[in-house]
Amino acid sequence: RDGWPNDVAFAPAAGADDVLKQAKLYHSISEATKTISLLFATTARKRVIGTKSLSIFKAIEKSFEHVVNGGNVGFLFGPEQSGLSNDDVVQADYTVSIPINKEFSSLNISQAVLLICWEWNKIKMSFLNDDKNLVKINKKLKKSTELSNVGDREYFYKQLDELLTKSGFFYSSEMAPVVKRNIRSLFNRASLTHQDLRTLHGIIRSCLLYTSDAADDD
């Protein structure tokens, strides 16, 4: 809104210049998260779009374990006035809620970020205080999950959308956005690996070839 980088931001950052200097500006969530393999969306209200929900404590535990095993983790925070839209949330693997007074469930973005970072730092310090864990980190672990990243999933959704559009699956233009969100939610709940995506791409290619051959025969 005010442009970035912005010199005005450094004074209230109270010396955290390194953090600000590493901050990057992106024009879309898909662009910002394309290398992320486990994405969480913070939300104050219960969603009905099918995305799995975790408490902040479970989310931090799961995210830290993923990082230790070589994955990339991201947390999405929405605008203070409106929060994340359903289209934003459906791009995440999980939604995260912070347990606070239900009558005052809205936090400003700095408070939400602080709480997530505080819980993350707590589990990190506990982990690093165990010498056995330090040895484990230094051993260059093999990824236990090899989850696909958001960028790869976005490409898959684009290909799938093309196939479903050609086949006439979206019979109602009004309902198409809702159906697409539901499809994303369905696949995101499956925690797709790179191998899963390769298999799904193979299925899509086969279907596209079939429909193309059928059209030629006609």
Segment roles from a protein language model:
Residues 1-2, 46, 100-104:
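Short, acidic/turn-prone active-site loops that include or flank metal/cofactor-
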Residues 88-137:
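Structured adenosyl-cofactor binding patch, chiefly the S-adenosyl-L-methionine
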